[in-house]
């Protein structure tokens, strides 16, 4: 259960029903939305971007951390909440309720990424569609982490009995052997 207020348009939602609603509104898989929120806010949903208590941005929420990047003058959380506080009717901003952030952020993901060809976690991070100028996330390991989280949402039976389609980019002029994984910073 959750003590978070997820009411919207006269209806009270829990997180599963909120994500189903957001998925229908955006054309984005509710599983994808759930894994993105877990990636951005943690499994227990304790991220500051959804606390509603950040000084100067009380009552604003940014479940998917859109517009959240660190600068010399502001943290990623503050920049994300600045974004959440702006007005944009298409994405239900300002995100001054949890549900407006969940639904509006999903609409943003759908319209800006999923429904225009960047329709895998990999393509959201590594933009091979535009090309190269339109990435969703800064964390290079996010696609790996999100795909692992998404896999855990399905039972072993479902995974064994469901046909999966993989979109795998093929790069030209690559070296014969793979580079070692980076370590540290």
Regions found by a protein language model. Name each.
Residues 54-185:
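Non-catalytic cell-wall polysaccharide-engagement segments
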Residues 1-16:
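N-terminal export signals and maturation junctions of secreted/periplasmic proteins
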Residues 16-20, 30-34, 99-106, 123:
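Extracytoplasmic/secreted envelope proteins and their assembly/folding machinery
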Residues 11, 15, 28-29, 94-97:
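Secondary-structure capping and boundary motifs in well-ordered enzyme cores
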Residues 42-46, 130-133:
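Flexible loop/turn segments at secondary-structure boundaries
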């Amino acid at each position: 259960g959750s003590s978070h207020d997820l009411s919207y348009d006269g209806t009270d939602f829990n997180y599963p029903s909120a994500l189903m609603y957001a998925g229908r509104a955006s054309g984005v898989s509710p599983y994808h939305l759930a894994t993105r929120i877990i990636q951005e806010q943690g499994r227990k949903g304790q991220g500051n971007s959804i606390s509603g208590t950040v000084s100067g941005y009380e009552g604003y929420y940014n479940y998917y951390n859109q517009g959240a990047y660190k600068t010399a003058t502001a943290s990623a959380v503050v920049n994300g909440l600045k974004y959440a506080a702006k007005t944009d009717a298409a994405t239900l901003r300002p995100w001054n309720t949890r549900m407006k952030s969940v639904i509006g952020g999903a609409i943003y993901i759908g319209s800006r990424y999923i429904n225009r060809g960047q329709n895998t976690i990999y393509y959201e991070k590594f933009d091979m569609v535009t090309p190269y100028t339109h990435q969703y996330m800064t964390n290079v390991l996010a696609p790996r982490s999100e795909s692992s989280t998404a896999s855990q949402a399905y039972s072993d039976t479902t995974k064994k009995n469901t046909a999966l389609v993989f979109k795998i980019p093929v790069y030209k002029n690559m070296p014969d052997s793979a580079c070692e994984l980076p370590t540290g910073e």
